[in-house]
C-alpha cells in the first residue's frame, strides 16, 4: 500500500516518523529516506538508534533550491538518485534473506497480501520526496518505477507539499494536511524538538 501526506500544514514528517516507530516496534524493517531537509532534524537522532531502521539522507548542506548553483543541482540530483538505488537494493536484500546489509536484524517472514511470496514486513519512507520530483532534482523514472514495482510486503510513505499527479493516483491513502494557524505568522521561529 502507498500513503501520501501532502499539504501546507505541519505534521507530515511527524506522521511518517510515527509510522516508522510503529513498524520498528512490530519487528519490521524501516528504510527512512529524507530528501531536501537541510539541517539535521531531531527525529533522525532517535530513528538512528533503532536497529530495524536504516536512515538515508544527503549529508551535505546545499541550502534552499533558489540559492543552488547549477553544479549544486547536478550534485544533489546524483545523491538523490543514489539514495533511490540504495532503497531498491535494501528492499531486495530484505526480501531475499530477511535482513539488510547494514542492520543484520532477523525478522519473521510473513506472507504478503496476495500469498505469492514470503517476505518480511518493510516500511519505506520517502520524506519530502515531492520537492526533488517537482524541481527535477532526482531521476523521476526511478521514483515512478519504484512505485510501480513496490512489493506487496512493503508499505510506502511519501511526504511533501504539491505532490505530482502520478503520486496521488498511486496512493491508497492520501491525507492533505492543511495549515489553519502557525506560530511563524507571529514571527516565532522554528523550535528544536517541535519543528525540527
Predicted regions span which residues?
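Short, glycine/charged-enriched secondary-structure capping and boundary segments
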Residues: 18-19, 45-48, 70, 138-142, ...
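Conserved nucleotide-binding/hydrolysis micro-motifs of P-loop NTPases
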Residues: 37-39, 61-62, 130-131, 162-165, ...
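Residue-level preference for the first positions of well-ordered beta-strands
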Residues: 1-4, 29, 121-123, 155
